[in-house]
Amino acid sequence: MSPKPDIRTAMNKLENPLRDDVAGPAPRHQTTQVMVGDVAVGGGAPIVVQSMTNTDTADVEGTIKQIAALARAGSEMVRITVDREEAAAAVPHIRDGIRKLGLTTPIIGDFHYIGHKLLAEYPACAEALDKYRINPGNVGFKNKRDTQFADIVEIAIKNNKAVRIGANWGSLDQELLTKLMDENAASANPRDVRAVTREAMVQSALLSAARAEEIGLPKNKMILSAKVSAVQDLIAVYQDLASRSDYAIHLGLTEAGMGSKGIVASSAALGILLQQGIGDTIRISLTPEPGGDRTREVQVGQELLQTMGFRTFVPLVAACPGCGRTTSTTFQELARSIQDFIRDEMPEWRSRYPGVENLNVAVMGCIVNGPGESKHANIGISLPGTGETPAAPVFVDGEKFRTLRGENIAADFKALVIDYIEQRYGATPKPDAAQMVPAAE
């Protein structure tokens, strides 16, 4: 017979004081700040969202168009492939085209195998880029590796450019990996093969950074990354990398995949590391659907940072998931309409309404959580659920403001959102909703 539950013990647990510390991430890992163009990375600067084009870099107009789209979506740095002479020759024209559009987004050159040759033979390319990405696993092989690595570093020093030393387990330095595997096999207590591979990743990045410093590249010109495609391995690699250095760190899960799988994998890995204070810049490496929108990776990166409370980029739209009480699609359609409307308007709103990115909007589907959740938002609406009175109360800054009825609820609510933004964040902002005059119901 099982013992009776101790009611007094249970009550004592309930009466224990709640945590009085503020919920939030661990303190940021202290890193050396690096300037990439006019964007600060590390050293306590806001975590930067970056992206990469998938155009043929030799296609100047196509690459300009995609960089502009990524930048306008919120990418704060954009990386392009520089894989051959035609691409290197195109880089200055791409930079000029972007600047003519009024965009100052830093452009990063991604180099593999022949970066030393391209940068030396196309000095205008070396000058036009804001940062060079070097992969220590393929910068050169055998006796050429150190020389070709040094060539790129010296060009970076000459042009006062930042460098990312980016190890990737798909192109890991095989000499280093073989050396560590042999040492591990001879050990009395050999480690798991994956653990040795992770160690090779970290060593590849750190040894390359140390070599770059010996050549003369200062720490405030270097960013490190060590990307793998498995979530748990990525977390372990970056934890180790952060514990052993104070270089600025770029986070990314390589080959994350398509659609929801790629979003979930990247968010799971990067979310844990960011919560631990690790990471100065991020990229969500999504495989786009054929003909899909490349800016999706920027949006996901922003949403990850915003939902975790690190930064604000666009107003948040809270919406309930729906249940049997919400058999119509009205609230879903309104939530999508408001969210799309906000994203479409943000390029203009950023300059016109400073601070609008902090706005919270709620679109709820029934009476259960609708009014309460709407009160927590700056402006929220509680639509009627199945069998409820066909009326939608609107709450502004915690107070009931108006009840909408009829067939134009969506348009009426959107108009109220615009009115709120103009009054709260416009040229002569007002402190609260008291300035908005509610209409008679």
UniProtKB/Swiss-Prot annotation:
<keyword id="KW-0004">4Fe-4S</keyword>
<dbReference type="GO" id="GO:0141197">
    <property type="term" value="F:4-hydroxy-3-methylbut-2-enyl-diphosphate synthase activity (flavodoxin)"/>
</dbReference>
<feature type="binding site">
    <location>
        <position position="373"/>
    </location>
    <ligand>
        <name>[4Fe-4S] cluster</name>
    </ligand>
</feature>
<dbReference type="GO" id="GO:0051539">
    <property type="term" value="F:4 iron, 4 sulfur cluster binding"/>
</dbReference>
<keyword id="KW-0414">Isoprene biosynthesis</keyword>
<dbReference type="InterPro" id="IPR011005">
    <property type="entry name" value="Dihydropteroate_synth-like_sf"/>
</dbReference>
<dbReference type="GO" id="GO:0046429">
    <property type="term" value="F:4-hydroxy-3-methylbut-2-en-1-yl diphosphate synthase activity (ferredoxin)"/>
</dbReference>
<keyword id="KW-0411">Iron-sulfur</keyword>
<keyword id="KW-0560">Oxidoreductase</keyword>
<dbReference type="GO" id="GO:0019288">
    <property type="term" value="P:isopentenyl diphosphate biosynthetic process, methylerythritol 4-phosphate pathway"/>
</dbReference>
<feature type="binding site">
    <location>
        <position position="320"/>
    </location>
    <ligand>
        <name>[4Fe-4S] cluster</name>
    </ligand>
</feature>
<keyword id="KW-0479">Metal-binding</keyword>
<dbReference type="Pfam" id="PF04551">
    <property type="entry name" value="GcpE"/>
</dbReference>
<keyword id="KW-0408">Iron</keyword>
<feature type="binding site">
    <location>
        <position position="323"/>
    </location>
    <ligand>
        <name>[4Fe-4S] cluster</name>
    </ligand>
</feature>
<dbReference type="InterPro" id="IPR045854">
    <property type="entry name" value="NO2/SO3_Rdtase_4Fe4S_sf"/>
</dbReference>
<comment type="similarity">
    <text>Belongs to the IspG family.</text>
</comment>
<feature type="binding site">
    <location>
        <position position="366"/>
    </location>
    <ligand>
        <name>[4Fe-4S] cluster</name>
    </ligand>
</feature>
<dbReference type="InterPro" id="IPR016425">
    <property type="entry name" value="IspG_bac"/>
</dbReference>
<dbReference type="GO" id="GO:0005506">
    <property type="term" value="F:iron ion binding"/>
</dbReference>
<dbReference type="InterPro" id="IPR004588">
    <property type="entry name" value="IspG_bac-typ"/>
</dbReference>
<dbReference type="GO" id="GO:0016114">
    <property type="term" value="P:terpenoid biosynthetic process"/>
</dbReference>
<comment type="function">
    <text>Converts 2C-methyl-D-erythritol 2,4-cyclodiphosphate (ME-2,4cPP) into 1-hydroxy-2-methyl-2-(E)-butenyl 4-diphosphate.</text>
</comment>
<protein>
    <recommendedName>
        <fullName>4-hydroxy-3-methylbut-2-en-1-yl diphosphate synthase (flavodoxin)</fullName>
        <ecNumber>1.17.7.3</ecNumber>
    </recommendedName>
</protein>
<comment type="pathway">
    <text>Isoprenoid biosynthesis; isopentenyl diphosphate biosynthesis via DXP pathway; isopentenyl diphosphate from 1-deoxy-D-xylulose 5-phosphate: step 5/6.</text>
</comment>
